[in-house]
Amino acid sequence: MTSIVVAALYKFVTLDDYVALREPLLQTLLDNGVKGTLLLAEEGINGTVSGSREGIDALFAWLRSDPRLADIEHKESYCDEQPFYRTKVKLKKEIVTLGVLGVDPNKQVGQYVEAKDWNALISDPEVLLIDTRNDYEVAIGTFEGAVDPKTRSFREFPEYIKAHYDPARHKKVAMFCTGGIRCEKASSYMLGAGFEEVFHLRGGILKYLEEVPQEQSLWRGDCFVFDNRVTVRHDLSEGEYDQCHACRNPVSLEDRQSEHYVPGISCPHCWDSLSEKTRAGARERQKQIELARQRNQPHPLGRDPRQSTLEN
């Protein structure tokens, strides 16, 4: 029986005192044995955490005791082992970094579409369907008919839209992302750029995979997640992908059969672009990671690459 609850959460809400919230929030996480990373900014809160059932419930009881977060929603999945090494609360300018001044989901967002209604919307031939995630995420799974912007970070999304789409020609735009936060902010940007009918998937891909029966699904592949599970399948069970610590790309079972795959050091996506200095550093890093795992200790060398994309 799985014992670890993984909770993905976010809410766009004005938090003028977000700096002062950091310490009590961090203490709540630590007191309840909850691990993972939460981001705080004036525009809201975002992150993924994991812990026992009691620990996660205690965290959300604390969050919802603040009237501004009383209706915060989250998505849960489950795993057998703790997927995060550390507990962090970071202060940021944005809880998901778009880098465009004036974009404020607290003031305007597109139309939310529930998971049960998503298939009907994206089956409309007049709807432009855009995957707002990074290129390596799209490569392992996306919705049927979705456009891949091939962006490496969310900061590249505005320029992609400017270069490829015109509000006068593209009347209906639907967007999606892992948990809903990126496409919600993207919808605010799109409205500000003049697009009139903008839709986004409430709860993101994770909510869709949770609620829509697989036989009715228009999702193809796995969904990348920002923890040590790497990917999840349609029933939110852990997928078969691993992740290369050197380049952060997901690696499939086939990739792991390659002569260029060395756990923690290189994979078919990056083996020919790494310097010997980088390889040497990766070897030492992997050695320390394995030692830490054997001792059941936190990752000893800073940021876990599986969490680093949370902000991008």
Curated annotation (Swiss-Prot):
InterPro entries: Rhodanese-like_dom, Rhodanese-like_dom_sf, TrhO, TRHO_N. It is an enzyme of class 1 (oxidoreductase). GO terms for biological process: tRNA modification. SMART domains: RHOD. One of its GO terms (molecular function) is oxidoreductase activity, acting on paired donors, with incorporation or reduction of molecular oxygen. Residues 282-293 have a biased composition (Basic and acidic residues). The active site is at C177. PROSITE patterns: RHODANESE_3. It holds the Pfam family Rhodanese. It catalyses: uridine(34) in tRNA + AH2 + O2 = 5-hydroxyuridine(34) in tRNA + A + H2O. Keywords: Oxidoreductase, tRNA processing. It comes from the Bacteria. Residues 123-217 form the Rhodanese domain. Its EC number is 1.14.-.-. Residues 282-312 are annotated as: Disordered. PANTHER family: RHODANESE-LIKE DOMAIN-CONTAINING PROTEIN 7-RELATED (PTHR43268:SF3), THIOSULFATE SULFURTRANSFERASE/RHODANESE-LIKE DOMAIN-CONTAINING PROTEIN 2 (PTHR43268). Belongs to the TrhO family. Catalyzes oxygen-dependent 5-hydroxyuridine (ho5U) modification at position 34 in tRNAs. This is tRNA uridine(34) hydroxylase. It comes from Pseudomonas aeruginosa (strain UCBPP-PA14). The lineage of its organism: Bacteria, Pseudomonadati, Pseudomonadota, Gammaproteobacteria, Pseudomonadales. The gene is trhO.
